[in-house]
Swiss-Prot record:
The keyword ATP-binding applies. ATP binds at residues 10-17. It comes from Acidovorax sp. (strain JS42). GTP binds at residues 59-62. GO terms for molecular function: ATP binding; GTP binding. Belongs to the RapZ-like family. This is Nucleotide-binding protein Ajs_0902. Keywords: ATP-binding, GTP-binding, Nucleotide-binding.
Length: 287
């Protein structure tokens, strides 16, 4: 079947509606809050009437039927459908702040309890438990520090690459701001020589020629780059054979400005001919 289906799930307040808007802008026929039990019949019907790209969003309000989703997606794959799964997430403190700012109730907050409505943090923990099986199967996008426009751009970038090949997402980040929740592999490069302590390089980034020249001259940097590249060379085929659509490789240094940026750029250049590759610089891009 000549059809691509994108299924968006995730935590309430994580930005699922924004992601769905990105898909709508990209030409997908989109439906929000689709009951999971209708997924297969909906996809088949929309394929007959609206073309070859369909996107649906589901949330925890359909919790009792969510266990049906993995089986339905497996059935679609057996029919030759290209299925992509995205799971949007954010840290609890960010989700609490978003609910406070919008003054919206959590979908599970009014579930019947003897003591009354559930406290928000308790509700969020329950939601995480209910959605855990879907999270394990999906590409996770951490929206904790993403503005709406950045999330729109990132989703469009993810879906602009062919679905038939593994997509490698290389991401630089600063440990002082925390490790991203969507990383599959995290490499700590804080032990490498730091251009921050070179006065002429401090204001530059790992994309700038003087910083690139400086780091290329450091034997430890070359060794780290080779070790990470060799590790990925060894295991990416196995991940692709295991039907992984996306793999996020996060490289972290102290400030997310020099060393991690340089390594992300070099690794992306190494693998872009073999796999779909995307670059993200969390601190530089304001992500």
């Amino acid at each position: 079947m000549d059809l691509e289906v994108v299924v968006i799930t995730g935590m309430s307040g994580s930005g699922k509606s924004v992601a769905l808007h990105a898909l709508e802008d990209a030409g997908y026929y989109c439906v929000d809050n689709l009951p999971p039990e209708l997924l297969t019949s909906f996809v088949e019907l929309e394929h007959a009437h609206h073309g070859h790209r369909v996107a649906v969003a589901m949330d925890v309000r359909s919790a009792t039927a969510l266990p049906l989703v993995p089986q339905q997606l497996a059935g679609l794959r057996e029919q030759g459908v290209q299925v992509r799964q995205l799971f949007l997430d954010a840290t609890d403190d960010v989700l609490v702040r978003r609910f406070s700012e919008t003054r919206r109730r959590h979908p599970l907050s009014q579930a019947e309890m003897r003591e009354g409505p559930r406290p928000l943090l308790h509700t969020m923990r329950l939601e995480r438990e209910l959605l855990a099986p879907l999270r394990e199967q999906a590409h996770v996008i951490d929206t904790s520090t993403l503005r709406s426009a950045q999330l729109l751009s990132y989703v469009k970038d993810l879906l602009s690459v062919p679905p038939s090949r593994l997509t490698l997402v290389f991401q630089s980040f600063a440990f002082k701001r925390g490790i991203s929740m969507d990383a599959d592999y995290v490499f700590d490069v804080r032990m490498l020589p730091n251009p921050h302590y070179e006065p002429l390089l401090r204001a530059l980034t790992g994309k700038d020629a003087p910083v690139i020249d400086y780091l290329r001259q450091q034997p430890e940097v070359a060794l780290m780059l080779a070790h990470i590249g060799d590790f990925l060379d060894h295991w990416l085929d196995a991940l692709a054979h295991n039907h992984r659509s996306y793999v996020t490789v996060a490289i972290g240094c102290t400030g997310g400005q020099h060393r991690s940026v340089y390594l992300v750029e070099q690794l992306a250049a190494r693998f872009e001919g073999r796999w779909n590759t995307l670059r993200r610089h969390r601190e530089l891009d304001g992500i």
